[in-house]
A protein has these predicted regions:
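Carboxylate-rich, polar loop motifs that coordinate divalent cations or form catalytic acidic clusters
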Residues: 1-352
Length: 352
């Protein structure tokens, strides 16, 4: 405990560590193949869903209370169970009673909480990210651009009625845009992160867009956008294969930004995932551990095997923040780690 004295305002006691890290390694699970975790999701039933590269979906029941892992609380789903593909890159909880599952292709499946089975819905290929704008519209990021899927429902069973492609042409030229990340800024603006083509600010109502490039500094990997976040102070952040970028302003013909790389104290340049905690810190997953970044003080701190993490080399797409607990999850080559903010003990004693 750290005791802090004030001038006439009493004494405050704060616990030393504000965060707790939890690990689950693939070696702890009753599965034969050990493949990198590429997607993460939790649900209201305390299930932890892990999408893997080439080993299907792993569901850990009551994950926060589990002490051991066996076939009684770990279920694996593969193509034999209805998955479209065993390489799973994204999850999204639907407004309906299903879980969307996106994979290498042919593309999209869903898990029904009603019948507890996996079903296929679309042949979209190489789907890395998905956003359910409403119960009738899905936006899907794939290797050939952006897809808008129009969905109808029979009860809790979805049916794709129409598919429309966007961003297949940029500046009048045929362009194969590989979309890796999405961030919904509001109900009309969707930010898209691409492999090598920068970021796109896309209007879901009009179909108009602005392509924002950061490689004016002569470093092409900075346009390899792996994750996007708008923080609580309305600052837009982009994680890439060459560090962290803050978008300061953007006009039609001009972009102003601030970049952070290993040259500026960032512990590792590859930023796979990014989330913000309630204190305004950004948490970044990298090739060498988890990085805590204070955007105001511009101070970095790294967590890895030296600080007790069993998972410290992370994967693209594998980042998630639970709306149920606030915990931040990152998936890696040998498992998953999550951090939860501990309640800071405030013991205020005011002298008489």
């Amino acid at each position: 405990i750290i005791w802090i004295g004030t001038d006439g305002q009493g004494v405050f006691a704060y616990t030393k560590d504000a965060y707790t890290f939890c690990n689950i390694t693939l070696n702890q699970l009753p599965i034969k193949k050990k493949r990198p975790v590429r997607a993460i999701q939790t649900d209201k039933d305390e299930n932890l869903w892990l999408g893997t590269k080439d080993n299907g979906v792993i569901c850990i029941k009551n994950y926060r209370m589990a002490k051991e892992y066996s076939s009684s609380n770990v279920i694996q789903y593969t193509m034999q169970d209805g998955l479209a593909n065993n390489s799973v890159f994204a999850f999204s909880l639907s407004r309906k009673n299903i879980l969307w599952i996106c994979s290498d292709g042919p593309g999209i499946s869903y898990y029904s909480y009603d019948d507890q089975k996996i079903h296929r819905i679309s042949d979209a290929r190489y789907v890395h990210t998905i956003y359910e704008a409403s119960d009738s519209v899905l936006w899907v990021g794939a290797d050939k651009g952006l897809l808008k899927l129009s969905v109808e429902w029979k009860g809790n069973k979805p049916i794709v009625k129409d598919s429309k492609a966007f961003l297949s042409e940029v500046r009048g030229k045929r362009f194969d845009i590989q979309i890796y990340s999405m961030y919904a800024e509001n109900d009309s603006i969707l930010w898209l992160g691409t492999r090598g083509s920068g970021a796109f600010r896309f209007n879901m109502y009009t179909g108009s867009y602005q392509n924002i490039r950061f490689n004016k500094v002569g470093i092409p990997p900075i346009d390899d956008i792996l994750c996007i976040l708008k923080d609580s102070k309305q600052r837009l952040w982009f994680g890439s294969s060459y560090g962290l970028t803050r978008l300061d302003s953007y006009q039609k013909d001009s972009v102003s930004f601030t970049s952070y790389s290993e040259n500026k104290g960032l512990p590792n340049n590859t930023i796979h995932g990014m989330k913000e905690d309630s204190r305004g810190n950004l948490w970044l997953s990298s090739n060498t551990g988890i990085i805590q970044f204070n955007p105001d003080s511009e101070v970095f701190r790294q967590y890895n095997y030296k600080t007790g993490l069993d998972v410290f080399e992370f994967s693209d797409n594998a980042y998630y923040q639970s709306p149920f607990t606030g915990s931040i999850f990152f998936g890696g080559i040998n498992g998953v780690v999550w951090l939860q903010e501990d309640s800071i003990t405030e013991n205020k004693m005011v002298p008489e």
